[in-house]
Swiss-Prot record:
Keywords: Ribonucleoprotein, Ribosomal protein
Protein name, as recorded: Small ribosomal subunit protein uS2
Record bears the keyword Ribonucleoprotein: yes
Pfam families reported for this sequence: Ribosomal_S2 (PF00318)
InterPro entries given in the database record: Ribosomal_uS2 (IPR001865), Ribosomal_uS2_bac/mit/plastid (IPR005706), Ribosomal_uS2_CS (IPR018130), Ribosomal_uS2_flav_dom_sf (IPR023591)
UniProt GO MF annotations: structural constituent of ribosome
GO cellular component terms attached to this protein's record: cytosolic small ribosomal subunit
Glycosyltransferase found in the keyword field: no
Family the UniProt entry places it in: Belongs to the universal ribosomal protein uS2 family.
Example GO biological process: translation
Length: 247
């Protein structure tokens, strides 16, 4: 999948925040301002975005796990959809403190959710009173909302992709503590410091968010497909050298 500058323009990637809210550390990525709004330099954004996608592709080819993080209203739905399409974990509700740094505790909640799902599947609700069944459903819904997207993650991810680094400071800090690379969309009002793969761009427009997220999901699927293709070709190539001994 290749993204063009025209597509970025159409999605409004270049629109930053109001000039009075700017972070001076984003100066290298700002083209200018119009109507008191900073304009992001897409000639900087495009190669940086493509570089991030290259990294994602390589990570996916090596069977790496990338955790998608986006809990703002305009990013929630598309982020969950695209992460699921790419077969990756995601956080689309609130980021719970310790989700990475205290993953052992999170695993207990994941086990509880999976046990509840299995119990429901087995018809456990039928033997409960109305009140018990209601309490059960409520707890399960709450767990699904907070950790449903990471229930199959298994362990600490190899990288995290964050749609709005300012809004998800805790996630970025936890990743940094554990040495997990961060791919992050950074708008003009936030700092790019501590982000391994910076994508300077609009983090509020749902169109822009959809562009970033779809691109990352596509890169993951491409990386995996390339890895499978290489295995197939290696196996085919090996056929020429197989000597069958008779008798």
């Amino acid at each position: 999948m290749s993204v063009t500058m025209r597509e970025m323009l159409e999605a409004g990637v270049h629109f930053g925040h109001q000039t009075r809210f700017w972070n001076p550390k984003m100066a290298p990525f700002i083209f200018g301002h119009r109507n008191k709004i900073h304009i992001i330099n897409l000639e900087k954004t495009l190669p940086m975005y493509l570089d991030a996608l290259k990294y994602v592709r390589q990570l996916a080819a090596n069977r790496g796990t990338i955790l998608f993080v986006g809990t703002k209203r305009q990013s929630r739905e598309i982020l969950a959809e695209e992460a699921a399409r790419a077969g990756m974990p995601y956080v689309d509700s609130r980021w719970l403190g310790g989700m990475l740094t205290n993953f052992k505790t999170v695993k207990i909640s994941i086990k509880r959710l999976k046990d509840m799902e299995a119990a429901k599947e087995a018809g456990a609700l039928e033997s409960m009173s109305k009140k018990e069944a209601l309490m059960f459903e409520r707890e399960m819904e709450k767990l699904e909302k907070s950790i449903g997207g990471i229930k199959d993650m298994g362990g600490i991810p190899d990288a995290i992709f964050v749609v709005d680094v300012g809004y998800h400071k805790i996630a970025v800090t936890e990743a940094a503590k554990l040495g997990i690379p961060v791919i992050g969309v950074v708008d003009t009002n936030h700092s790019p410091e501590g982000i391994d793969y910076v994508i300077p761009g609009n983090d509020d427009s749902s169109k822009a968010v959809a562009l970033y997220v779809r691109g990352v999901a596509d890169a993951i699927l491409e990386g995996r497909a390339n890895a499978v293709q290489e295995v197939v070709e290696a196996a085919r190539g090996g056929d020429d050298f197989v000597e069958v001994q008779e008798g």
